[in-house]
């Protein structure tokens, strides 16, 4: 991108706001070097990455990036053998902890079912150096001091130091507390000079204590003397301190060498956390400006819904819908100055730059944006005093440069095209420049106050007029963009509101040609029609949203009803099974009792009477249980019966064996000790499988009442999407849905084409079509099922 384009579109101001959300100098360095990408795949991945970080912030509120610092120079020094200071080593340990903590944070979210594939890939590159981290923190305290426990030798030396200091203080305090000493000392204190303990002695008593004078007061009346009696003790203390320093240096060198061994891993981890800091800064900034992830396409069109400029307070700015690249490739915004035209122009430019930098943009969901190889902008008054260029000349220098470089992959933004010269010539130049850029296939947004360009949009197929709405009642622009309506000056209406007489205004109208008046009246009617159409659309949109809400509520109630019904059926079935089981047990008991009675010759009971008794008892079983007991394999075509086959006599519910066929429809059947004739229609063939064979058992899948009426495939890879479509259509048919919607987005069109090719071949599909305006348009396919 041209540096001038980034400057006039205030890209660096966006980066300054982004910097406020970084957690470390590592992230800040990434932001400072941020420039828009022109690679489609890279931009899509950056947008997806920012979206994952935004999801983390929505779920967790923040990310644990604290304690991370830029330790790269320290690690590189360790590699070449320089000894690191305690604080430098502590920074390394803290950064290692921060990277390890960040890795655990993301992995825990993934383990809990949050889908973060890109962030998961990032943290997978972090290698835990827990042992090195603990070695450093075990040796260095939070304040940057080497602790006693760093080594046994250091602990012993410091014990000696404390003992020596205690003995020295004790001796000196005894000296200062004596009654004789009071008159010889300037103050009864023990202090330190040149790292040796001393006492403040008056000048005239310097010879009383002997020893060494280390300092004197500003007046010269007080000498700081190390008495002779503690010279040896101070010497011993100094020797211990030298040993302490040597041991500390040994420990620091040892830790530095440990860092040098793992230097490459540490530097790799630093790069990962730098990227994570940068990524989460983007997500926090998106939250700040209420931005969303745009759909990125490679088809050179954009659809910005309710777009806002990120540098203007969202509570103040008026959002606008801006479309470019489908029905028209050029927008010409006409109308008076100070009407918000330049803000609209800059909004388009900065949204494109942000999106191509992986930043979410301040628009509504489902907004689309395309990738431009070049963005050219001629905005503002940039006169060059050194080159003595006028406003017009300055603009023309930029325009000449743009015309040399613009092509079909370019976005060109012109502010007040042709301004600064004779209006008639300026308008003619503006038209020629627009024709030249449009013929190259570039996407163009231009602003102008020349009325001649109002007709330009009507005479060119790929060009559309637009204006910024002006409220005559308040005498101020509303900053609302009106696509398809050219701007008008409103001079007469403003003058009338300010008190100019009707007579003067009418005379002024007479000075304007009839054609001009007709055009102004036509524009006024267009504005009114636009307002009415927008009002109607808003009402329709509100009704659509209300309908969707009612639909979702109805679907929820249907699901709840079906769940409750299924629950009651299961409960009833269970109760029925329990009753049947009880009846069977009772029947078996009765039959057993009757058989025992017959054996005892206490009753003259026949087997067929026993069978009939049991059949009557089983007849009391609930119908649902009988249905449940029918095996799927029995619904197959009727088996060819042969003598010796085992069958079930349905009337009695008993198993029997076929003896011989006595007629076309009857068989002689052996049931226990009883032989009887049974019709084929009253028997069921029992297939007894061989032990060595395994038969496939058919299963019947019930309806799933939790199938959604929509399938969202956006972001899916082609193969995964097709597999999901296949399963979804099967589930929808089982759920008896008459119609479903498949959301594939507009994108490159590959996924949309793949879905519709599949639907053409699916036997369960009756018809399909694109969604209507309220259903998602070309981004949705509505499927009618058989």
From Swiss-Prot:
Keywords linked to the UniProt accession: ATP-binding, DNA-binding, Endonuclease, Hydrolase, Nuclease, Nucleotide-binding, RNA-binding, rRNA-binding
Binding site for ATP: 335-342
SMART domains, A to Z: MUTSac (SM00534), MUTSd (SM00533), SMR (SM00463)
InterPro entries (alphabetical): DNA_mismatch_repair_MutS_C, DNA_mismatch_repair_MutS_core, DNA_mismatch_repair_MutS_sf, MSSS, MutS, MutS2, P-loop_NTPase, Smr_dom
Domain named Smr: residues: 711-786
Assembly and binders: Homodimer. Binds to stalled ribosomes, contacting rRNA.
PANTHER family: OS10G0509000 PROTEIN (PTHR48466:SF2), OS10G0509000 PROTEIN-RELATED (PTHR48466)
Record family assignment: Belongs to the DNA mismatch repair MutS family. MutS2 subfamily.
Protein name: Endonuclease MutS2
Classification lineage: Bacteria, Bacillati, Bacillota, Bacilli, Bacillales
Gene that encodes it: mutS2
